[in-house]
Amino acid sequence: MAKLYYYYGAMGSSKSATLLMSAHTYERQGKKVLLFTSSVDDRFGTGVIASRVGIDKDAEIIGRNDNVVELIGDTTGISCIFVDECQFLTGEQVMQLSDIVDNDNVPVICYGLKTDFKGELFEGSEALFELADSFNEIKTTCSMCESKATMNLRTNNGKPVKTGNVIQIGDDEYFPMCRKHYKKSFL
């Protein structure tokens, strides 16, 4: 029986690299996979899943208004569907992914952030915690210590930012942080 999987972690935890390696394993075994990413993430170009370690692969784009079931279409012969940057999906789109799992018996493996720079769940993350069959944390360490990073610190011109739009393109940088150092950043 297929499942809906959610792999989540802080910034820099190799989520995209893990997705690409998993998809490669399927393909090396002769299995057909579909790769998707959110239209919101265009850091490496549109329709590309890319890792900071230098590996990338083309992917289909899921727009905010897309019906995922219609976008994917016929799943005959598909062994697995991979979705990167799933935190940017809507709750309805996550529900549609669960429909594919339940109705077509095709596993869907989603990768993304758990929370934004404010420490709040993204809409897609929240829906995945409600609907996924399996949750797996991809761990990384805090930028300031050796503790596990669970938060994402946004900085602008080297100063911590806790307000503003959730999706920010420009001069902002993000750092994986443990809760203790995340909170200390604002003191």
Predicted regions and their residues:
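Conserved RecA-like ASCE ATPase "motif II neighborhood" in helicase/translocase motors
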Residues: 60-82, 91-94
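Sensor-1/coupling segment of RecA-like P-loop NTPase cores
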Residues: 101-123
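Walker B catalytic acidic pair
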Residues: 84-86, 112-113
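Short basic (Lys/Arg) and small-residue
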Residues: 132
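Structural motif
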Residues: 6, 80-82, 109
